[in-house]
């Protein structure tokens, strides 16, 4: 028992977890279809039929090192996801990973001011001004990743961030991630 105590322990906390994983919060949502369109206002359009999808949306925040939601909220399926991104719920040095539905420059500014790191995929239609552009190459001269410092402008908000573009070898694509400027 003594040799395997950490593996056999009933303590559910993970031992040996990287420190940054303990700081990572993942925000996501999923839609549960209920009653077709009879009761709930639809969200989006089905790509084949063009009909709207009704139901409820489950929004959750998960501590990555625990794998269990720490915040779960239910809304109509048509509710915009960005309400879940509440900067006051996050502390200095925490990392928040979220999808494109959560892009909100005012909230990104608040997160940056609080010292919270955020990472999200970039929407294709975002407009920005490039301030710095640097391509990092491997020894063979191929791009490993590209780092751009940019300014996103919306109304009176000027949010400085960085865009990281890397090559996804499995998919043959170049996904773009947005993160605060660190």
Annotate the PLM regions:
Residues 1-10, 14-41, 45-182:
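Single, function-defining residue in the core of a domain
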């Amino acid at each position: 028992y003594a040799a395997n105590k950490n593996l056999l322990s009933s303590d559910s906390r993970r031992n040996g977890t990287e420190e940054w994983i303990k700081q990572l919060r993942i925000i996501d949502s999923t839609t549960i279809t209920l009653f077709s369109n009879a009761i709930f206002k639809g969200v989006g359009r089905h790509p084949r039929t063009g009909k709207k999808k009704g139901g409820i949306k489950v929004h959750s925040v998960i501590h990555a090192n625990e794998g269990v939601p720490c915040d779960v909220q239910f809304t109509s399926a048509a509710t915009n996801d960005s309400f879940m991104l509440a900067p006051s719920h996050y502390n200095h040095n925490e990392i928040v990973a979220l999808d494109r539905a959560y892009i909100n420059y005012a909230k990104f500014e608040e997160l940056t001011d609080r010292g919270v790191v955020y990472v999200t995929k970039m929407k294709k239609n975002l407009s920005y001004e490039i301030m710095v552009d640097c391509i990092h190459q491997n020894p063979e001269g191929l791009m490993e990743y590209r780092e751009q410092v940019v300014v996103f402008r919306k109304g009176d908000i000027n949010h400085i961030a960085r865009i990281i573009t890397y090559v996804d070898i499995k998919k043959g694509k170049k996904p773009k991630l947005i993160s605060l400027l660190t």
